[in-house]
Curated annotation (Swiss-Prot):
The species this protein was found in: Methylococcus capsulatus (strain ATCC 33009 / NCIMB 11132 / Bath)
Family per similarity comment: Belongs to the class-II aminoacyl-tRNA synthetase family. Type-1 seryl-tRNA synthetase subfamily.
Top-rank taxon, per record: Bacteria
GO MF term list: ATP binding; serine-tRNA ligase activity
Residues annotated for L-serine binding in this entry: 231-233, 285, 385
Binding-site residues for ATP, renumbered to this chain: 262-264, 349-352
PROSITE patterns: AA_TRNA_LIGASE_II (PS50862)
InterPro entries: aa-tRNA-synt_IIb (IPR002314), aa-tRNA-synth_II (IPR006195), aa-tRNA-synth_II/BPL/LPL (IPR045864), Ser-tRNA-ligase_type_1 (IPR002317), Ser-tRNA-synth_1_N (IPR015866), SerRS_1_N_sf (IPR042103), SerRS_core (IPR033729), tRNA-bd_arm (IPR010978)
Quaternary state and interactors: Homodimer. The tRNA molecule binds across the dimer.
Keywords: Aminoacyl-tRNA synthetase, ATP-binding, Cytoplasm, Ligase, Nucleotide-binding, Protein biosynthesis
Catalytic reaction(s) noted: tRNA(Ser) + L-serine + ATP = L-seryl-tRNA(Ser) + AMP + diphosphate + H(+); tRNA(Sec) + L-serine + ATP = L-seryl-tRNA(Sec) + AMP + diphosphate + H(+)
Name assigned to this protein: Serine--tRNA ligase
Pfam families: Seryl_tRNA_N (PF02403), tRNA-synt_2b (PF00587)
Domain notes for this protein: Consists of two distinct domains, a catalytic core and a N-terminal extension that is involved in tRNA binding.
Length: 427
């Protein structure tokens, strides 16, 4: 959530900045609410002053032996008007907060202009796409050919956009997860965290998924209401909700492996087939809670931590800075890491690393105690995938295939595979 003061003192400038995203701020609605709020506050203050004055008069009139009933009636009437004003002020505040929940974050100044992913800016590339002397298969043909992926069985169990992995591919997915966790905890200084996969609505409001993106969530029909997590970002970031973190504890760096659940409402096309876009998938998520002055540097570091995984696996990728129109609702700045997929002959997103500045923290009331002032101030929050496990599995299958449809296991994963370095019939 943006600072409400922006809508009181810098409404037009805030609207202009939000316009970079293609978001049209309803300045008339905000302006009307603000004008009414200010008028009510002035009126309420005047009523309070008048009530206080008349209350003093009651004591003086009583001391003089005068009839105080008219004064008591007047004070009672003022009290009723004050209650009405206070109720209207509370209503205005609720309406203002409801509007604010639908307003995205302001973008950093170095986020490029643009409306769609076509306007994103490539920052750099690492590695060269493999050159095959045969027509490379996509991950679906490879996985099914190995007899280790069963989409029909998954459809029988759950429906479309699910998969059953067995044998060496199930183990390869586990190996990828363990490898990522080991690097992030052992080399990058993250604390491994296990969290609930069901969360309440307050948690999703805190990180920005609610109310705007409810259709993307799986809601459990139960009392109390729960939602399946769309990403570990939600429960992990909410660990600091309503907390004041002491300065010496910062930065907080968490890594968390969870399944993720998304309805993928409205998605279609090539990603409906295979493992790229499923209702249930796994991620290793990186979350950082930092001092405001450290968030820009932390964003670069977190993105680099995700890149290290790709490089250790030998997977070609590129870093892309998202343009204004493609940056997510809660983010001030986002880098996407896109891995090369030979089966699609294109780079596809495998990690999204974002700096939210104080946008989530204001919703969460997540604060730190500034030692210079002794007062609580909002933290900055960041997160990114380190990496999406299923998409990393896809990238390994497609980049490490041979003509026979076998898969060469990346060297760093061989110990996690019990020494197996080749997956396939002749392995």
């Amino acid at each position: 959530m943006l600072d409400p003061r922006l809508f009181r003192t810098q409404l037009e400038e805030t609207a202009r900045q939000l316009g970079r995203r293609g978001f049209v701020l309803d300045t008339a609605a905000f302006g009307a609410l603000e004008e009414r709020r200010k008028a009510l506050q002035v009126e309420t203050q005047n009523l309070q002053n008048e009530r206080n004055s008349r209350s003093r008069s009651i004591g003086q009139a009583k001391a003089r032996g005068e009839d105080i009933e008219p004064l008591l009636a007047a004070v009672q009437g003022l009290g009723e008007r004050l209650k009405e004003n206070e109720a209207e002020l509370a209503s205005i505040q609720e309406r203002m907060e409801a509007l604010l929940l639908g307003v995205p974050n302001l973008l950093d100044t170095d986020v490029p202009e643009g409306r769609s992913e076509a306007d994103n800016v490539e920052i750099r590339r690492w590695g060269e796409p493999p050159q095959f002397d045969f027509e490379p298969k996509d991950h679906v043909d490879l996985a099914v050919g190995l007899g280790c992926a069963d989409f029909e069985a998954a459809a029988k169990l759950s429906g479309s956009r699910f998969v059953v992995l067995t044998g060496p591919l199930a183990r390869l997915q586990r190996a990828l997860t363990q490898f990522m966790l080991d690097i992030h905890t052992g080399e990058h200084g993250y604390i491994e965290t296990y969290v609930p996969f069901l969360v309440n609505a307050d948690s999703l409001r805190g990180t920005g998924q609610l109310p705007k993106f409810e259709e993307d969530l799986f809601k459990v029909q139960h009392e109390p209401v729960f939602y399946l997590i769309p990403t570990a970002e939600v429960p992990v970031t909410n660990l600091v909700r309503d907390e004041i973190v002491e300065e010496e504890r910062l930065p907080l760096k968490y890594v968390c492996h969870t399944p993720c659940f998304r309805s993928e409402a409205g998605s279609y096309g090539r990603d409906v087939r295979g493992l790229i876009r499923q209702h249930q998938f796994e991620k290793v998520e990186l979350v950082q809670i930092v001092r405001p002055e450290d968030s820009r540097e932390a964003h670069e570091a977190l993105t680099r931590h995700a890149e290290v995984i790709l490089e250790r696996l030998g997977l070609p990728y590129r870093r892309v800075l998202l343009c204004a129109g493609d940056t997510g609702f809660s983010s001030a700045k986002t880098y996407d890491l896109e891995v090369w997929l030979p089966g699609q002959q294109s780079y596809r997103e495998i990690s999204s690393c974002s700096n939210f500045r104080d946008f989530q923290a204001r919703r969460l009331q997540a604060r730190w105690r500034n030692p210079e002032t002794g007062k609580p101030e909002l933290v900055h929050t960041l997160n990114g995938s380190g990496l999406a496990v299923g998409r990393t599995l896809v990238a390994v299958l497609e980049n490490c295939q041979d003509e026979a449809g076998r898969i060469r296991v990346p060297e760093v994963l061989v110990p996690y595979m019990g020494g197996v370095n080749l997956i396939g019939p002749a392995a």
